[in-house]
Structures are given as structure tokens and as C-alpha cells.
Amino acid sequence: MSLLRNFFSFTFSANSIITKPYFAIPIKAMEATSELNLNYPKPISAPPPPISKDIELRRAMEASSKSSLFNLTRDDILYEDEYLMAVNKPKGVYCEAVLRSAPQIVLDSSSEYHLANRLDRDTSGVMIITKSHKVAAKLVKAFTEHKIRKSYIALCIGSSPNWRRVTVSSGHGRSKHGAWRVYAALDVGRVLPGGSFVRDMETTFEVVSVNSVKNESCELEDVNHVIVAEGERELSCGGDDDDVVVVVRAFPRSGRTHQIRLHCQYLGIPIRGDVKYHGVYEWNGRTFEGHELHAECLSLDHPVTGDSIVIRAPLPYWAAGD
């Protein structure tokens, strides 16, 4: 197993727009000394840049307005039977709006519809809605026990990776200011400000393409497993160019909040539009409202029949060519 430590941040002014990622100075320069004095574990990913707050607030308001008017259509349904349905959640809509409209599209007045999985506001793709409390409990248990296989696809702007496939294990938790951060794997179980604990998270990444060049044509190496820990950074990037378009496929083993987004930030390939985690907001003359992350596939055993099910959502425009 390799040891990996990587720091990423952005330079910005009060009125700047995020246009490209930068390698960072050590995170300890950004942390308040009081947190260190209390012996809390130190996050090893950069905090959200100040400019992201206003952008995220505006996006949230726009999503609330859009969600209030949202209704599922038959074209959004990817799979359905008497126990559950899978839908293709659009970008920029809250999960609750999708759940609210589900009974209407199937002409069912039942109040037992539940979200089996949740997607971030700007993440699109496969979302499962159960039709009874009993089925919901079974699927939640399956997700918790990592029995459901998930794959996502993301478009990132950052430094060209020199790896083809890598599994990243780290800690996950909220820093004292409430932001989700990456922590060292050795910190799992330690107490955080506010009384929560560092929890484990693990994601496997595969490079799909770099600047539209397919994986098979890239001169990349397989890296078996990287444990995020204190120590020298052994998983390096392929060059000094920090404006490379990298499409990756992600397979999260755990299901932590913002997990893929955090690990992409940590690896130096933040997701395009993901300003909270240092993704570019403006790039090549365009602005991007929301991050480019799509839940493309869920594979599971049916909670009632036991049949194997593979549910795929159509790829968004930015991934369709990959």
C-alpha cells in the first residue's frame, strides 16, 4: 500500500471568479490555532473558497424555485415494478421534489414512498424510490452494508493524472466551520468539533479520458490502493498543466456526504463547476452552474424477488462521447 498526502487550494480575491485550480500551501496555514490546541484532527483538504458562498446561495435559491415546479415524466422512469421505481434525477433539482412528484406520475396516492438513496442538488442520475416502508428498510440496509454497487461519471478540470485506476481510502468529517473535509485515514474514529467523529470513506477511480483521449491511449499506470495519511505525497500528477479535462468513473464503496467531490478535490482534479470544492466556475469563456457529476449505474439484488437488477441512466452531454 502506498501513502498519499496531497494539498489543493485556490488563490482568489474578494471579487474573483474561480477559473483554474492551483496546488496549495499546507492546510495548517488556513486553520485556526484554537482547533489545533484542542487536539482535534487536522483536515488535509482545503476549505471552501470564500467566493463559493455567494455562488452556492444563488444556486440554492434557483434550485428551490425550479424544484417547486418540478414534475416527473414517464421519460424519467428508468425502472418500475410494484415495489420500487428508479428515476433519472435531473441536475439542479432537490431529491425531495422528485420524491414528491413520484406518486403523481404512477397515479398512486400512497404515503409510503421513500428515497432509498439521495443525490446532491446538482448531481444527476439514478435515484431509487421505494413504495413501502418494508422495502425501504431493506434497501437502506443494503446500501449501508455496501451490497449495492454504484458507479458515477465526472468531468474534472485539473492536473493530468499519471494513474489509470486508483482506490483512495481516507477519513471524512466536518471541520469546526461545518464544511465537509478529507481527513487522514489514521484519524478515523477521532472526535471532531461539535461532537461528531471522523468516519472512513473509500472511492475507486478510473480515468476514462484525458483531453478527450481515451484511457487506452493514455500513458498511465495502475495504482492499487492509496491510503490518505500523514507523509510524503507518492501519487503525483503527470505534469505542470492544471487546465486538463479529465473524465473519470468513480465507484464509491462508502456513501459519505460529498464523497466523490471531496476525493476529486483531494486528487487535484476538482469537478468542473464544483466551486465548494475548488472546481472551476468559469472556464474557456463559459460559466458552469453546478457540478458535472452523474450517477450512471446502480447494480443490486431486488429487495423482494432477489433478482439481479442493473439500472442505468442516460449519460449527460459532457459524458456522452466517453
From Swiss-Prot:
Belongs to the pseudouridine synthase RluA family. GO terms for molecular function: pseudouridine synthase activity; RNA binding. The keyword Transmembrane helix does not apply. It comes from the Eukaryota. The active site is at D120. Keywords: Isomerase, RNA-binding. GO terms for biological process: pseudouridine synthesis. The keyword Isomerase applies. This is RNA pseudouridine synthase 1. Transmembrane segments: none annotated. It holds the Pfam family PseudoU_synth_2. It is an enzyme of class 5 (isomerase). It catalyses: a uridine in RNA = a pseudouridine in RNA. Its EC number is 5.4.99.-.
